[in-house]
Amino acid sequence: MSSRREGRELALQALYSSDVEVMDGTTVLKRIMENFGDGSEPAVDAHSRSFSFAAELVNGVVANRAAIDQRIEEKSKNWSISRMARVDLNILRLAVFELFYRPDIPKNVTINEAIEVAKKFGADDSPAFINGILDEIASLLPDKE
């Protein structure tokens, strides 16, 4: 698994946990890092590329959450954010952050990665749901090279 994919998965878990436990995303990310694996050692090194990318994503989503949620709400026809599954919503938040705040990542990569994470963590219909909304949102952006 690539370090960015692992970072996206860690970020998703941190954002989901922070929704459930009403806790700071970075604190949750560190706790997840410490508790995964067999318990004998941290599953992810705090200095690893995966953790660094996850921390950037979590901090970016937290800092820009209102703008991100507004973009999701505008393009999710017949779905309010309050009705969305928490996993799906947080995958969308991560992807929208990448689309608008990480111009170095091509939008097709961001969308594909979100779909792959949704296949692993979401419901059966999550990948199609996420793809539909992200395609709508990405259509607002110029192509990234």
Swiss-Prot record:
Highest taxon of source: Bacteria
Pfam families referenced in this protein's UniProt entry, alphabetically: NusB
Assigned keywords, A-Z: RNA-binding, Transcription, Transcription antitermination, Transcription regulation
Single GO biological process annotation from the record: transcription antitermination
Record GO cellular component, one term: cytosol
Alphabetized CDD domains for the sequence: Terminator_NusB
Gene3D superfamilies noted in UniProt: NusB-like
Disulphide-bonded residues: none
Gene Ontology MF annotations: RNA binding
PANTHER family to which the protein is assigned, alphabetical: ANTITERMINATION NUSB DOMAIN-CONTAINING PROTEIN, N UTILIZATION SUBSTANCE PROTEIN B-RELATED
Family of the protein in this entry: Belongs to the NusB family.
Role according to the record: Involved in transcription antitermination. Required for transcription of ribosomal RNA (rRNA) genes. Binds specifically to the boxA antiterminator sequence of the ribosomal RNA (rrn) operons.
This protein's name: Transcription antitermination protein NusB
The organism of origin for this protein: Geotalea uraniireducens (strain Rf4) (Geobacter uraniireducens)
Lineage of source species: Bacteria, Pseudomonadati, Thermodesulfobacteriota, Desulfuromonadia, Geobacterales
